[in-house]
Amino acid sequence: MTVPISILEKFKLLNYDKVLNNIDNPKGKNKIILDTDTANEIDDQFALAWTLLSEDKIDLIGVTAEPYSFQHHREELIQAYKIINDNEINNTNIELVNSYSSWVKGLVDSEIDPKNIYFDTPSEGQEKSYNEINKIFNLMDINTNNRVFRGSTEYLEDFDQPYMNESTDFIIQSCLNNLDEKIYVCAIGCLTNIASALLIEPKIIKNLVVVWTSGFPSYSPLNNKPSLNLVQDVKASQLVFSCGVSVVYLPGFNVGAQLTISLPEMNEFVKGRGKIGDYLYYLYTNNPLHKQRGVQDQLMKTWIIWDIINIAWMIEPSWVSTIVLDMPDLDDKLFWTQKKRKQPMREAVGIDRDSIFRDFYIKLDNLK
């Protein structure tokens, strides 16, 4: 279901110019909260490490743990695996098969039955992320100073029943205690914590700026189902794009997807750069998604470090080319649709991949 009018009426909408000001390119040093499903794969760890290495541009006031889970893939993956193995592909199932063909191929090549793959629950994902956040701080010998918070253990099921937890409370209090400043929440996973905070205290739309990476460009006709960040919690995604909060949208597909890194680069620029460099190298060479999907030929593959796009925009907006356009709605079928009421949104359309990684590598190199 899309967001009910009764829910949207709780939000006092900002005028057009106020939203434009909120989504303007960041200048100087800004307060951010990193909202992250850190243990999901490996890109969040890169994003958090780069954030902690960028104190000149980022005032990291908190890190909030998000839930994550791939459980929504299980039934379709098993079904596609059986169809392909039994050679029963036809016009009625070809779309499903195409969605999972590369995953199934990896499992077949690795002799893995999808029925034997364990997918973390959202609650387990949140707790693993919380622990992983603390691990990154420890590896970098940085005191958390009570800046790490547990988040929601489940996805938003009812707009009338948001989840109060450490993360939502921290987001709310950060906004209310700094009314004259923008509070950027760099969301690099699902939007559960942010949506719950908005539903609990709608007043925070005044100075909350949601910087989110996910999905296809808002002008794309493609379905957003492939986006993990979006599809895990559809209600939360719909709420953020409907309630009037200021949004900087950084599409993963086509834009963030350019942030690839290779094993030779990891060897040359990351490995040996302090405990965190060695850990990032370990993650790259022991990627949990490689194991989950039966990826074997890692040597000649790159990996996308999606989530550093948020941090790149906060550090140097020119590295992430953006335009201001009308914010869309997200329908129940996960397509972007035209919104009746005009609200501006900043959206990424291009990226300076080399400058982004150069900054990251230089800062890591100082840890040698």
Residue spans of the language-model regions?
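N-terminal acidic, glycine/proline-rich low-complexity segments
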Residues: 2-368
